[in-house]
Design a protein with these regions (language model features):
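Alpha-helix N-cap/helix-start motif at coil-to-helix transitions, marked by capping-box chemistry
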Residues: 50, 55, 121-124, 149
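Amphipathic alpha-helical repeat scaffolds of TPR domains
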Residues: 148-160
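Membrane-interface aromatic/basic loop that binds lipid-linked glycans or pyrophosphate carriers
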Residues: 10-11, 132, 163-229
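All-alpha amphipathic helical-bundle segments outside canonical DNA-binding/catalytic cores
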Residues: 140-149
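Residue-level detector of family-conserved "landmark" positions at structurally sensitive sites
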Residues: 71-75, 144, 190
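Donor-binding/catalytic cores of nucleotide-activated saccharide
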Residues: 1-94, 103-105, 109-117
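Residue-level "edge-of-site" marker
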Residues: 74, 99, 193
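Catalytic core of nucleotide-sugar-dependent glycosyltransferases
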Residues: 98-107, 113-141, 157, 161-186
Length: 229
């Protein structure tokens, strides 16, 4: 629930038990990034991540060695990174299609609601740490592609962060242009499968792919207005 609206968080349509291989195939990889049809809703790709919607066995936490990473290092997504480490050691996960927790988010106090001038650099650290996990655990090409998609989708969060800054419009567009022309992002957009996206997201990420920073900025201002209603 936010200040202006309330909605149910539905991940799977029914109670589901995931055994070891299904945990890897259907859950663990999603903490790295979206694939296939999951890309059709970029705004929902991290719905699985919050720790407030989960109960963990202490033994699993101890087995995984997972710890929350300081937001000063990775900017955001501390829940998702924690789950990436935990679910990598999970042999069985049960999803309950029931509402057991009412979570209220006060936008004015959220760590993601204000401008963060370090967010770009912090997210590069997050991506580097994810790459290290993929390499050290030999998770393979699917995980690499999922991370590639996360990087590409990330211009939404980075761009919204820029739009709420007090900088001039020209400086905001310049900052967006600098990001989408970075080699890491150019590679990500080159491999992003846009055919999964609905038309409005296809337009947004198409602008990013082609380096059209003003188009990205214009669409971000529309998105920001919708969010702020």
């Amino acid at each position: 629930e936010t200040e202006n609206r309330s909605s149910r968080k539905v991940i799977f349509p029914e109670t589901t038990v995931f055994e070891k291989e299904e945990v890897r195939a259907k859950l663990h990889r999603r903490f790295v990034g979206a694939m296939g049809e999951e890309l059709s809703h970029p705004e929902l790709v991290d719905s699985l991540c919050p720790v407030w919607g989960k109960l963990y066995r202490r033994s699993l936490i101890q087995k995984s060695g997972a710890r929350f990473v300081d937001l000063a290092e990775i900017g955001s997504y501390e829940d998702g990174f924690f789950n990436l480490e935990v679910f990598g050691k999970a042999d069985r996960v049960v999803y309950l299609a029931a509402y057991l927790y009412h979570y209220r988010r006060d936008g004015s106090s959220s760590v993601t609601s204000g401008y963060n001038p370090r967010l770009y650099d912090q997210w590069q650290t997050l991506y580097d740490r994810m790459e290290a996990i993929i390499r050290s655990n030999q998770l393979g090409s699917e995980y690499e592609a999922a991370l590639n998609n996360r990087i590409a989708l990330g211009i939404l969060g980075l761009g919204l962060n820029i739009t709420v800054s007090t900088q001039s419009m020209g400086k905001k567009v310049k900052d967006i242009h600098r990001i989408i022309r970075q080699e890491r992002y150019r590679k990500a957009y080159k491999n992003l499968p846009l055919h999964y996206f609905p038309i409005h997201w296809k337009l947004f990420y198409g602008c990013a792919r082609h380096g059209f920073a003003f188009g990205v900025y214009a669409l971000l201002t529309v998105i920001q207005r919708i969010i702020s209603r």
